[in-house]
Amino acid sequence: KTHEKKIVSLAGRILSLRKMGKASFFHLQDSMGKIQIFIKKDDVGESEYENFQLLDIGDFVGIEGDVFKTKVGEISVKVKSMTILCKSIRPLPIVKEKEDEVYDAFTSKEMRYRNRHLDLIVNPQVRETFFKRTKIISSIRYFLDNLGFLEVETPVLQPIYGGANARPFTTYHNALDQQFYLRIADELYLKRLIVGGIDRVYEISKDFRNEGMDRNHNPEFTMLEFYWAYADYEDNMELVEKMIRSVSKQVDSEKINWDGNEIDLTKKFKRIPFFKLLNEKLGEDISQLDINKLKKLCIANNLSIKKNENYGQ
């Protein structure tokens, strides 16, 4: 709107087309959004308009023209010149729009997961997730850096894995003639830095666990670990609460919906001892139960257990 009546140059992918004789409309999209484009044969010439008639959804073009507002109030660009930048060899899923309603959208989960690039093109809410994730990571770094934490990088290939109870991925180092493991956690190396005198450290890194996978668990995942000398668990709880509140504010998500419930992240987090909460929910003092009674309790609450599970597990 601030560019109305100004000449602008734009480039992007054609996302929709409405060809109508001597004048046509199309939507041009880049990573930041989309805008309506108006092209008229009398403005660009017969040759250039004939080239436009050959375009399809998915093609990339560059245009130069005047910004204006249509009768219905939509900001658009009237083309003075157009350049074809790249031809799309394969057709895109066509998302149709009419009177603010969307139909024939690319919504099949199976197709979306197998074609994530198409999902990003035609579903803007998916693309927004990528931008929001990057902003979350940046906000976490900003928060910890301002508290004096030092971001570090620890080895991904480790001769001895540890820091968690998980099965590792294994690989072989030919030069050293030795088996190595992809890290399952950063803990041990970060603690060495604490021992070495760096009192506040953190790492946001890829970790790998060679175990089952579902929509909530992936063998390759990103994890934040931080360690803080001279601080106890109360200090850490306070820090995590402040960090979540700070990050949620930065990404405009102070109130979120989870499983049908609204969660207000601006409010003080409830704190309750773990065993106290379990005892309240189960109606028993689990610290007084032997291993057999604990197993029966797990089965009664639909928790799968193995025959050799011990008390700690």
What positions do the PLM features span?
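Class II aminoacyl-tRNA synthetase catalytic cores and aaRS-like
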Residues: K1-Q313
